[in-house]
Amino acid sequence: MFYQDNFDVIVIGGGHAGTEAALAAARTGQNTLLLTHNIDTLGQMSCNPAIGGIGKGHLVKEVDALGGLMAQAIDHSGIQFRTLNASKGPAVRATRAQADRALYKAYVRSVLENQPNLTLFQQAVDDLIIENDKVMGAVTQMGLKFRAKSVVLTAGTFLGGQIHIGMENFSGGRAGDPSSITLAQRLRERPFRIDRLKTGTPPRIDARSVDFSGLEAQPGDNPTPVFSFLGKREHHPQQVNCFITHTNEKTHDVIRNNLDRSPMYAGVIEGIGPRYCPSIEDKVMRFADKDSHQIFIEPEGLSTHELYPNGISTSLPFDVQLQIVRSMKGFENAHIVRPGYAIEYDFFDPRDLKSTYETKFIEGLFFAGQINGTTGYEEAAAQGLMAGLNASLFAQGKEGWSPRRDEAYMGVLIDDLSTLGTKEPYRMFTSRAEYRLLLREDNADLRLTEQGRTLGLVDDVRWARFNEKVENMEQERQRLKDIWINPKSEQVDQVNAILKTPIAREASGEDLLRRPEVNYQSLVSIDGFGPALEDSQASEQVEIQVKYAGYIQRQRDEIEKSLRHENTKLPFDLDYKEVKGLSNEVVAKLSDAKPETIGIASRISGITPAAISILLVHLKKHGLLKKGE
C-alpha cells in the first residue's frame, strides 16, 4: 500500500550522513521523510566517541557554516576538547572533541524531532521505486510505499553487512542491528559498480577494572575550543581526562601467535580496511620493527563506565582479545564489556556520482556516507548535507550546487571521490587540498555562510551573527590601519619591547601586526592601540588575514589562473570517439567517467593537458563553448 502523503525528499538511514541530509532538505523548505530501521539509534556513534581531527575538523566547521548539525551537537556533548597542531600555522590547526555518546545522540534526536518539514518513520527499507531510470520513492520491510521526487540513500555499513569475530561471522549492519540484505540485493540488479570494504572497532572496557595509577593522563585544552560558530563554552558539559597506555612485546606475541585465527589474515575477509585506522593485528605485522604502539583510552560518557581503547581495533576471537587487553599496562585485570569486531559491507564506486552526489544511472537518487567508500563521521556528515541540499534542489527543479576544491574541503571530498574513486576507505586530510591556506577551520563561515544563506540553509540567527562578525572584522582592520607610530612617539618603548628590532620608521598598527613577533593581543596592549575586540572570532580573523595576506593573495592568483576552464560543461551524451585526436585510452576513460566539466576531466588519472586542449577545440568547433571560455 502507498502511504497517504507524498514527500519531496526521502532520506534512508539515520546516521551522521542521513541526519544532516534530512535536516538540509527540511531547512530548505522541502517536505522531507527520514526512514530509519530504529529511531532510537538516530545519530549514534557506531565506533569511536569523538568528532574532528586533522582535515575532519575542517569538514565539521564547513557543515556548521552551512547551517548543519554536527558542530552544535558536539559542543553540547563534548567531554574533552583539544586543538591539534596548535603550534603550527592556522591552515593545519584542527579541533577535536571526545563525546559523551548518550548526550550526542540525544541532542541529534531532539533537533530532528523539532525540525519543521521533517517526518520520522521507523521501518527498514527493502527496495526503491524506480520508473524509467528515475527514482519515485521507497518500499519498506512491511511493503509500505512512500512517494517522493528525490531519494537520498545513506546506508552506512548496513548494505550486505557481515560482522566477523574470529572465524565466526554473521549478518549485521552494526553490533545489535540487522543488515540490509534485501535492499543490497535490489541495488546489485542496477548498473552500479559495487565492491566490498571493511572496517573494525575495538573491545570496550569497564573503567572500574582498570588501574589508572600508572597511566599517563591526557587533559583537554583550557580554555576549551568551541566547534560551532554559534557555540559557547557554557554549552560544554563536564570535562574529563583521557589516558595513554601502550602495547608491548607480550601484546605483539599474542597477536602473532594467533594470526591463523584472524579472519583478515585467514582470507575470510576480502574487503579492504582503512589505511589510517588499521587493526592492531595489521599494525603489528606492517610495522614489525616497532615494539610498542600508543593506545588512547577514551571515556565513552559521563554516565557510563565504558572506555574506548583507541588503537586496538580487532577481529580476533574473544579469548585473544582478552589476552591483548590484559597484556597492556593498567589493564591486567580489565573486563571487556563488548568484544571488538570487523564488519564487511557493500560500497558503490563514487565515480558513478555527479558532483551533486546524484547517481549517473538513476535520476533523483543521491548517495552519501560510507556507501561512497568513505570512512568517518565527519566525511559522512559533509556528504549528507550536500546530498540533502541537492536532493532538495532537484525536487524544486533547480540546478544543483557543490563547492569547488578551492572553496571547501567539501569540494575536495566530492571531487576526489567522483573523479578518482577509491579502493579503500577514504579519509580526509589537510594534505589532500591544494589550497589549504585558504581552507582553514577559522574561515569556514567566511567561505560558505553567504552561499548557504542564498541556498536557504542558513537561518536568521546564524546570518545575523555572521554579519556582525564581518562588520567587526572590517572596522577593526580599518582602525588598525588608521593608528600610526614613529620612532619619536610616546609609546615607542612599549613597541620596541615587543619587536625584535627597534622601529626605524613610521608604521601603522596593521604594519606592526604583520611582523612575526607581534600578535593581536600584544598589539592592543600598547597605549593607544586598544581596546581589543570582544569578538574573539573576529580578532582571530584580523590577525590571520593581516599576517598571511601575501601568501593568501598568491594562492588566489593561482586559483584564478586554474579556473579559466574549470566549469566549462561537457555534454553528458558527448561521444568521445568522435573527438579527433584523442587516444583510445583517453576515449575509454572519458567515456567511462562521463565528467561533467573540463575541470573534472583534467583530474582523471591519465587525462593529459594535450587531451584537454583537444576537448576544448572540439567544444569550440561545435559551438559548445560559451563566450570568454
UniProtKB/Swiss-Prot annotation:
Keyword vocabulary terms for this entry: Cytoplasm, FAD, Flavoprotein, NAD, tRNA processing
Kindly list the GO CC terms recorded for this protein.
cytosol
**UniProt entry tagged with the keyword tRNA processing:** yes
Entry keyword annotation includes Amino-acid biosynthesis = no
Named cofactor requirement(s): FAD
Q: Which residues bind FAD?
A: 13-18, 125, 180, 370
One GO biological-process annotation of the entry reads: tRNA wobble uridine modification
A GO term for molecular function: flavin adenine dinucleotide binding
Q: Where in the cell is it found?
A: Cytoplasm
Superkingdom of origin: Bacteria
The role this protein plays is: NAD-binding protein involved in the addition of a carboxymethylaminomethyl (cmnm) group at the wobble position (U34) of certain tRNAs, forming tRNA-cmnm(5)s(2)U34.
> What is annotated about its quaternary structure and interactions?
Homodimer. Heterotetramer of two MnmE and two MnmG subunits.
NCBIfam families for this protein: mnmG_gidA (TIGR00136)
UniProt-recorded name of the protein: tRNA uridine 5-carboxymethylaminomethyl modification enzyme MnmG
User: What is the originating organism of this protein?
Assistant: Aliivibrio fischeri (strain ATCC 700601 / ES114) (Vibrio fischeri)
Lineage, highest ranks first: Bacteria, Pseudomonadati, Pseudomonadota, Gammaproteobacteria, Vibrionales
Q: Gene name on record?
A: mnmG
